[in-house]
């Protein structure tokens, strides 16, 4: 349940403090795209209750779960499904963008987490999302790109 209004040329999304859990299964077009599965997982940590996400397209697409749990999420993997218990109070820590989609997941989780998050292997994110730092800072995110010593 997220309040939204769809107009001819825009969508207005209103903030809420309560998000309902959902069940999602990735499918080929026109189903739910597997490429959105990992970013959605970060958002499911905000939902009150248990969300279930089933990956039917690719094996081994849950590398992001290790790092979300490290941030304080409560996610269990069972073969091709994950069970996301929420809401979680995510905390900043060091995580890894294991690929482009996991990187998007880590960015979304970091935006909600308390404290500072360091995302390693950021080249996956920068390669896949044009001007992502500028776009996110323009809406209030604090992001710093630095070289590791």
What are these regions (language model features)?
Residues 1-149:
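Short, structured segments at the rim of ligand-binding sites
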């Amino acid at each position: 349940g997220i309040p939204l209004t769809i107009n001819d040329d825009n969508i207005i999304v209103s903030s809420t403090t309560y998000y309902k859990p959902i069940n999602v299964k990735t499918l080929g077009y026109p189903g739910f795209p597997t490429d959105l599965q990992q970013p959605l997982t970060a958002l499911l940590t905000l939902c009150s209750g248990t969300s279930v996400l089933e990956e039917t397209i690719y094996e081994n697409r849950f590398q992001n779960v290790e790092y979300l749990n490290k941030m304080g999420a409560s996610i269990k993997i069972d073969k091709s499904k994950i069970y996301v218990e929420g809401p979680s109070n995510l905390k900043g820590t060091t995580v890894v963008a294991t690929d482009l989609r996991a990187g998007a997941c880590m960015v979304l989780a970091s935006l909600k987490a308390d404290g500072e998050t360091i995302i390693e292997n950021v080249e996956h994110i920068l390669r896949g999302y044009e001007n992502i730092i500028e776009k996110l800072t323009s809406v209030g995110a604090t992001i710093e790109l630095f070289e590791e010593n």
